[in-house]
UniProtKB/Swiss-Prot annotation:
It catalyses: carbamoyl phosphate + L-aspartate = N-carbamoyl-L-aspartate + phosphate + H(+). This is Aspartate carbamoyltransferase catalytic subunit. It holds the Pfam family OTCace_N. It comes from Prochlorococcus marinus (strain MIT 9211). Belongs to the aspartate/ornithine carbamoyltransferase superfamily. ATCase family. Its EC number is 2.1.3.2. It comes from the Bacteria. One of its GO terms (cellular component) is cytosol. The lineage of its organism: Bacteria, Bacillati, Cyanobacteriota, Cyanophyceae, Synechococcales.
Length: 337
């Protein structure tokens, strides 16, 4: 395996093709472990991982816990509701508390964009060597979700020998509430970075026309994009036209908790225009896999019938793949230190 040069994982804007390949190859090895009878590895024995989620989570939090334990790390999960946050403590001071207790890595989720990066910079300024892994921040980024989505797609397209090259030239649709989705932003970096074209599909209120500018230039402070030839990003308002052109579709939850205005007429009309069902998919000759980062609003983004058909709706496969992907990220961040 080639070298790994990231001290933290805040987003995927600085990921190279080599980085994506490293993560997916390692995740593939970790995924195969149970077949060999091994449930745990001593790779991170004696290391301390603190999971600091200042926002509710089921899949991400639990899979990080399982991933850390399968690598034999010591794990402590922070509970915001019973912490000193209720007394006015800041997320930075909470993080510093865990660093003082010896945490080697902090996995951080927060409802405000930029919090994991701010904590990483503060720790570096203080001379701390603790790694920060972003578990999702505001509307900004959710790198581990995008990587497990990529891993799921690669395994679908090339199940016998998964390879990052299998995604190149594919057209992947992202449908739904893109405006409020940190997952969509991270998926844009990973999919276009690996050579896929992306079609963004949704109502104008949830998908502004200028969203395609998101990956047109590196973010502030990053002068060079490590990917020379990214895939294209397009916008569509028609689900039917989008699916006709797509090799796979990632549909997104309507994030009502982040909507501060009336952006939709009603949920019924949204489902009729942008909801995905078995009936809609039957109109196309090729098999189109359906992904969703969860949690799913049944009958809104995906029909119940389709959601329960795991031969084509890969939501449970995504959940399974979250563990080896997060094992890979923790290992890459910590094994060389």
């Amino acid at each position: 395996m080639a070298s790994w040069n990231h001290k933290h994982i805040i987003d995927l804007a600085a990921f190279s093709l080599e980085d994506y390949q490293n993560v997916l190859e390692l995740a593939n090895r970790f995924k195969a472990l149970p077949k060999s009878g091994a449930r745990k590895l001593p790779a991170l024995q004696g290391r301390f991982i603190a999971i600091l989620f200042f926002e509710p989570s089921t899949r991400t939090r639990t899979s990080f816990e399982i991933a850390a334990k399968r690598l034999s790390a010591d794990v402590q999960t922070f509970s915001a509701s019973t912490s000193s946050l209720t007394k006015g403590e800041t997320p930075l001071d909470t993080a510093l508390t865990y660093v003082a207790m010896g945490a080697d890595t902090l996995v951080i989720r927060h409802s405000s964009s930029g919090v994991p990066e701010q904590i990483a910079k503060s720790l570096e300024k203080a001379g701390k060597k603790t790694a920060i892994l972003n578990g999702g921040d505001g509307l900004h980024s959710h790198p581990s979700q995008a990587l497990l989505d990529l891993f799921t797609l690669v395994n679908f397209f090339e199940p016998s020998k998964p390879d990052i090259k299998s995604i190149k030239g594919k057209r992947i649709a992202i449908v739904g509430d893109i405006l409020h989705s940190r997952v969509a932003r991270s998926n844009l970096w990973s999919l276009t970075g690996c050579g896929a074209d992306v079609i963004l599909c949704g109502p104008k209120s949830l998908l502004p026309n200028d969203f395609v500018d998101f990956v047109s230039s590196p973010p502030p402070g990053q002068l060079i994009d490590p990917i020379k030839n990214r895939g294209k990003v397009m916008i569509s308002r028609s689900l039917k036209e989008t699916l006709q052109q797509s090799d796979a579709v990632i549909t997104l939850r309507l994030q009502k908790e982040r909507m501060n205005q009336n952006l939709l007429t009603n949920l019924g009309s949204y489902h009729r225009e942008y909801g995905i069902s078995r009936r809609i998919l039957q109109n196309f000759r090729k098999e189109i896999p359906v992904l969703h980062p969860g949690p799913v609003n049944r009958g809104i983004e995906i029909s119940s019938e389709l959601l329960d058909d795991q031969s084509i709706c890969l939501t449970q496969e995504q959940v399974k793949n979250g563990i080896p992907i997060r094992m890979a990220l923790l290992y890459l961040l910590m094994a060389s230190k």
